[in-house]
């Protein structure tokens, strides 16, 4: 095994879902910037980046979220950094957002845009993504998990612990974030939370199914 391969595998063995962090140990600005950049630079279906990363630093807001975030009880108060990843709603070919991406960011030639839109529409139809608002949001949320995984992996490579969390009351958390002007509910919904910091205690040994049970060669 090469040194790079060993570094990668060691990082994955190091990473675990940290339930409680050492509140005295802080993730540096430069390390956290790197973690956020790996999220921002992550791949997404059709390169549409249907996400937003909200860094929660306000302690009062954390306290408001806590009663409705049963999966983040210890993490909210002990993690050095706490992020809520939002998924974008109604990402369709004719939406203002997608038009911004294909015209303003990707800068497709005007003559090619109708073909791009047709391809996008066909893809969403074939996968039943555009069946309704819920299926559109579920698809966007899938993309946020790609960014989430990359952020946690980069953190592990930096020796930083993390914990992803779905354990929250979606409606109440959305309501609180909207009241605090953190999220525009017309365009976004909370997808997943993730905390970063340094473990308070050493975890139990990692347990996974053997490779032959989860990998199949055809």
UniProtKB/Swiss-Prot annotation:
The keyword Protein transport does not apply. Pfam families: Nitroreductase (PF00881). The keyword Flavoprotein applies. GO terms for cellular component: cytosol. It comes from the Bacteria. Its EC number is 1.-.-.-. It is an enzyme of class 1 (oxidoreductase). SUPFAM superfamilies: FMN-dependent nitroreductase-like. InterPro entries: NfsB-like, Nitroreductase, Nitroreductase-like, Nitroreductase/BluB. Coiled coil: none annotated. Its cofactor is FMN. One of its GO terms (molecular function) is oxidoreductase activity, acting on other nitrogenous compounds as donors, with NAD or NADP as acceptor. Keywords: Flavoprotein, FMN, NAD, NADP, Oxidoreductase. One of its GO terms (biological process) is 2,4,6-trinitrotoluene catabolic process. Belongs to the nitroreductase family. This is Putative NAD(P)H nitroreductase SH0546. The lineage of its organism: Bacteria, Bacillati, Bacillota, Bacilli, Bacillales.
């Amino acid at each position: 095994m090469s040194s790079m391969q060993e570094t990668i595998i060691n990082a994955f063995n190091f990473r675990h879902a940290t339930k409680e962090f050492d509140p005295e140990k802080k993730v540096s600005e430069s390390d956290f910037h790197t973690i956020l950049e790996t999220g921002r630079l992550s791949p997404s279906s059709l390169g549409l980046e249907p996400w937003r990363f909200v860094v929660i630093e306000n302690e009062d807001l954390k306290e408001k979220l806590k009663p409705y975030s049963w999966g983040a009880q210890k993490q909210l108060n002990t993690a050095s950094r706490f992020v809520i990843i939002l998924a974008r709603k109604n990402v369709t070919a004719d939406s203002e957002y997608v038009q911004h991406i294909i015209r303003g960011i990707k800068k497709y030639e005007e003559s090619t845009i109708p073909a791009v839109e047709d391809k996008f529409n066909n893809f969403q139809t074939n996968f039943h993504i555009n069946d309704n608002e819920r299926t559109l949001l579920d698809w966007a949320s899938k993309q946020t998990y790609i960014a989430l995984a990359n952020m946690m992996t980069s953190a592990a490579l930096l020796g930083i612990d993390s914990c992803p969390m779905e354990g929250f009351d979606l409606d109440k958390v959305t309501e609180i974030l909207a009241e605090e002007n953190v999220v525009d509910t017309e365009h976004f919904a909370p997808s997943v939370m993730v905390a970063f910091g340094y473990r308070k205690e050493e975890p139990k040994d990692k347990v996974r199914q053997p490779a032959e049970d989860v990998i199949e060669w055809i």
